[in-house]
Design a protein with these regions (language model features):
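N-terminal [4Fe-4S]-dependent radical SAM core
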Residues: 1-93
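Auxiliary Fe-S-binding modules of radical SAM enzymes
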Residues: 2-8, 12-21, 225, 232-304
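Hydrophobic faces of well-ordered beta-strands that scaffold small-molecule active sites
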Residues: 19-23, 92-97, 125-127, 153-157, ...
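Structural recognition of alpha->loop->beta junctions
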Residues: 48, 116-122, 211-226, 298-304
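Core AdoMet radical
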Residues: 54-73, 77, 81-106, 121-134, ...
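Alpha-helix N-cap and loop-to-helix initiation/capping positions
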Residues: 65, 104, 108, 170-178, ...
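Distinct, well-ordered alpha-helical segments
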Residues: 106-114, 135-146
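Conserved C-terminal portion of the radical SAM core fold
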Residues: 177-238, 254-279
């Protein structure tokens, strides 16, 4: 693997392992409330078909004031940190993951994000969102936070695939040019962009998935970070109902590792890898069941 993992990059940059604090902004998504539509005009409700009721943020707490969320998240994370690291020397990423964390007026999010990034032990603000929910005032707000606090601001965009057909099938709710416009404006603003891709979406073959990766490899400016996630079929999702009615192919661990190797060969060496698999809750996982054995998966993917 020519690329570096984000954990390695952060440890080198900050001199210690950096831990994510899963936070909630209390937002929803435009394809959950009928704002988005398919090309035929059908209004979308319920979100992307693979997404659970937790908005793909099962480890985030329900919305409460951000300072309280940070302390609650630290209580969950700190037991994993070696006791030899003093509490004052611990470093964190404030990660707003669930749903679309820029869906609404920029000022609604400014206070929350500022409370997070201003925390003395937070080294980066990470915001999960959609490219169709990034008006210029929101991009300016994120840029101003980066400049004011001198800390990293990451924007994670859920692209999933470049296939128009798959995008309709999973109810993504926006077209590829929308992503391209958001990517350009975010990078022009000096913000760090991480793109989230899901592998083995229904109807996609190997070449379809590699087409998405080649697209990312050709982005200009070059892509800073990528999350490659195996599709997890989670209980209670629209995709779970689709899978149970007509199961589609999901890979073995070895097949998945082989595809990842090819994906990484295509991506630029300077692209930082933030994820190589999924991390859904075991209690909701329907398939593939091997994905629940996190230790086995990590060991298999360690030497890609």
């Amino acid at each position: 693997m020519r690329q570096r993992m984000i954990s390695e990059v952060l440890k080198e940059r900050y001199g210690t392992k950096v831990y994510r604090l899963a936070l909630s902004s209390g937002a929803t998504c435009p394809n959950r409330d009928g704002t988005c539509a398919l090309p035929d005009g059908t209004r979308l409700f319920g979100g992307c078909t693979f997404c659970s009721e937790g908005g793909s943020g099962e480890f985030a707490a329900p919305y409460v004031p951000v300072p309280e969320q940070i302390e609650n998240a630290r209580r969950r994370v700190d037991p994993k940190i070696p006791a030899r690291i003093p509490e004052k020397d611990r470093r964190y990423i404030a990660y707003f993951q669930s749903f679309t964390n820029t869906y609404g007026p920029a000022e609604r999010f400014r206070e929350m994000f500022e409370e997070a990034i201003a925390h003395p032990q937070v080294v980066a603000l990470s915001v999960g969102t959609r490219p169709d929910c990034l008006p210029e005032e929101t991009v300016d707000m994120l840029r101003s936070l980066k400049e004011r606090y001198g800390k990293e601001v990451w924007v994670e965009l859920g692209l999933q695939t470049v296939s128009d057909e798959t995008a309709v099938r999973i109810h993504r709710g926006y077209a590829l040019p929308v992503f391209e416009d958001a990517y350009r404006r975010l990078t022009d603003a000096g913000l760090t962009v991480i793109v989230h891709v899901i592998l083995y979406l229904p109807g996609e073959n190997r070449e379809d998935m590699l087409t998405t990766i080649r697209y990312l490899a050709g982005l200009a400016p070059p892509l800073h970070g990528v999350k490659l996630q195996l599709l997890n079929i989670l209980r209670g999702t629209a995709m779970a109902a689709e899978y149970e009615e007509a199961p589609f192919y999901l890979p073995t661990l070895d097949e998945y590792a082989d595809l990842l190797r090819e994906c990484l060969d295509l991506l630029p060496a300077e692209t930082v890898v933030h994820r190589l698999t999924g991390d859904g809750p075991k209690k909701l996982l329907i398939a593939p069941l091997w994905a629940a054995d996190k230790k086995r998966v990590i060991n298999r993917l360690r030497y890609l």
